[in-house]
């Protein structure tokens, strides 16, 4: 059995750890509330925007836009959104597992977040070339303008036919306890995808009534289709941030509770060891007195 000194040292160490995890839990909870609010508030706009674009397509005549044009996929670029920091449970592991399931030699990658960048930078193509094309900085307060920079980078690759498809991989926020790894294609834009609604995750958007468009539907689509890609990227980043802070808050809460449970066990062990030590001393004194007559 460990000595009382060793047990006291372990108790001090665990108390210090519990204080740290509790502080991290509180910080993560504060960030989680802000990130969740941003992610959830963006969903009705995303749903409504899908309806607007869908209502434009029938009025656009025979418009042929590269972002609507399906073509044989020789190269695909995947934008992967992870985290800069760890201590968020299996969030990054689950996402990377999802990427591994879809990985192909014709894939190229763009990353956001150090954890996924470190993994993707080690991937090599069939000729030994690096598959990671670029890395973008992850920020808690990332703006739509910054998300557009990423969208422009990806769309330029697509329009110049350096790639034939764009996909995104991120952790979709469901609730503080559930974050779902998502891998989906966002270009070429599927007309079927445009009318899907995120009913389970967001409040229903108001129905879009028929419009007379000015300028023409064709001109509007020319501008709105790239904007659609930008918004997909922005919403995915917001979801991933909400998932990250939720997962970290839950992980730190669990660590704090485990530390408290361990402290209780150690306190019992300490009291037992101390009681045995006192009993032993009493026996030694009694034995000495008996020997002295």
Curated annotation (Swiss-Prot):
Acyltransferase among keywords: no
MF annotations from Gene Ontology: ATP binding; proton-transporting ATP synthase activity, rotational mechanism
Cellular localization per UniProt: Cell membrane
Keyword field: ATP synthesis, Cell membrane, CF(1), Hydrogen ion transport, Ion transport, Membrane, Transport
UniProt membrane topology term: Peripheral membrane protein
SUPFAM superfamilies in UniProt: ATP synthase (F1-ATPase), gamma subunit
Gene Ontology CC terms: plasma membrane; proton-transporting ATP synthase complex
One record GO biological process: proton motive force-driven plasma membrane ATP synthesis
Function: Produces ATP from ADP in the presence of a proton gradient across the membrane. The gamma chain is believed to be important in regulating ATPase activity and the flow of protons through the CF(0) complex.
Subunit (UniProt): F-type ATPases have 2 components, CF(1) - the catalytic core - and CF(0) - the membrane proton channel. CF(1) has five subunits: alpha(3), beta(3), gamma(1), delta(1), epsilon(1). CF(0) has three main subunits: a, b and c.
UniProt family annotation: Belongs to the ATPase gamma chain family.
PANTHER family hit by this protein: ATP SYNTHASE GAMMA CHAIN, ATP SYNTHASE SUBUNIT GAMMA, MITOCHONDRIAL
Name of the featured protein: ATP synthase gamma chain
């Amino acid at each position: 059995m460990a000595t009382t000194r060793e047990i006291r040292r372990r108790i001090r160490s665990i108390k210090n750890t519990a204080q740290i995890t509790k502080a991290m839990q509180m910080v993560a909870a504060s960030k989680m509330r802000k990130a969740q609010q941003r992610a959830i508030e963006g969903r009705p706009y995303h749903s409504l925007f899908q309806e607007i674009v869908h209502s434009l397509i029938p009025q656009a005549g025979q418009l042929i836009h590269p972002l609507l044009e399906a073509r044989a996929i020789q190269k695909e670029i995947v934008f992967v959104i992870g985290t800069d920091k760890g201590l968020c449970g299996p969030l990054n592991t689950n996402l990377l597992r999802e990427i591994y399931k879809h990985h192909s030699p014709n894939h190229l990658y763009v990353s956001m977040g150090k954890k996924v960048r470190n993994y993707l930078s080690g991937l090599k193509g069939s000729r030994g070339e690096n598959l990671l094309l670029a890395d973008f900085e992850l920020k808690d307060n990332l703006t739509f303008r910054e998300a557009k920079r990423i969208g422009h980078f990806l769309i330029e690759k697509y329009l110049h036919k350096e790639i034939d498809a764009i996909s995104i991989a991120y952790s979709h926020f469901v609730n503080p306890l559930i974050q779902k790894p998502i891998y989906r294609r966002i270009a070429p834009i599927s007309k079927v995808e445009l009318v899907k609604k995120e009913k389970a995750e967001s409040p229903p958007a108001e129905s879009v009534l028929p419009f007379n468009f000015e300028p023409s539907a064709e001109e509007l689509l020319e501008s709105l289709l790239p904007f659609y890609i930008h918004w997909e990227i922005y919403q995915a980043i917001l979801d991933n941030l909400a998932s990250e802070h939720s997962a970290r808050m839950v992980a730190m809460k669990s660590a704090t509770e485990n530390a408290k449970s361990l402290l209780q066990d150690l306190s019992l062990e300490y009291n037992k060891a101390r009681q045995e030590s006192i009993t032993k001393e009493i026996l030694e004194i009694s034995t000495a007195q008996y020997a002295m007559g």
